[in-house]
Curated annotation (Swiss-Prot):
Record carries keyword Repeat: no
Function: Component of the biogenesis of lysosome-related organelles complex-1 (BLOC-1) involved in gut granule biogenesis.
Coiled-coil portions: 53-106
GO CC terms of this entry: BLOC complex; BLOC-1 complex
Full protein name: Biogenesis of lysosome-related organelles complex 1 subunit 4
This protein's UniProt keywords: Coiled coil
Subunit (UniProt): Component of the biogenesis of lysosome-related organelles complex-1 (BLOC-1) composed at least of blos-1, blos-2, blos-4, dsbn-1, glo-2, mutd-1 and snpn-1. Interacts with glo-2.
Key word Coiled coil present: yes
Gene behind this protein: blos-4
GO BP annotation list: endosomal transport; positive regulation of gut granule assembly
Record family assignment: Belongs to the BLOC1S4 family.
Lineage: Eukaryota, Metazoa, Ecdysozoa, Nematoda, Chromadorea
Length: 106
């Protein structure tokens, strides 16, 4: 039964420390640990906020990059169409020039 008594005693001491029922001398190390934990918790919260803000900014940049890539793809498609048009126009112009030369010779 000593194990149960030890656990019960430890639980009572813990409740006494957290409830402030013990003297300040006995809670000094616990207060130090709690203070350090509070500081670390605040730092972690700050890091969380900064990370969330940074990730939102990255998300917006990613959306803009995707939009720019789509615009570039459309631009390349239009360039390809323009090349085809120029080739066809050059071919038509060559044919007209040959026809003109034939008619001019007659």
């Amino acid at each position: 039964m000593t194990g149960v008594d030890d656990i019960s005693s430890n639980v009572h001491k813990l409740v006494g420390v957290t409830a402030g029922m013990n003297t300040a001398a006995s809670t000094g190390p616990m207060n130090l640990v709690l203070d350090k934990c509070s500081v670390v918790l605040e730092e972690l919260r700050t890091i969380q906020i900064l990370t969330e803000t940074h990730s939102e900014g990255l998300s917006e940049q990613l959306k803009m990059t995707e939009k720019n890539i789509l615009e570039m793809e459309n631009l390349f498609d239009q360039i390809d169409q323009l090349c085809l048009f120029v080739q066809k126009a050059k071919s038509d112009l060559d044919k007209l020039e040959k026809l003109y030369n034939v008619v001019d010779r007659q």
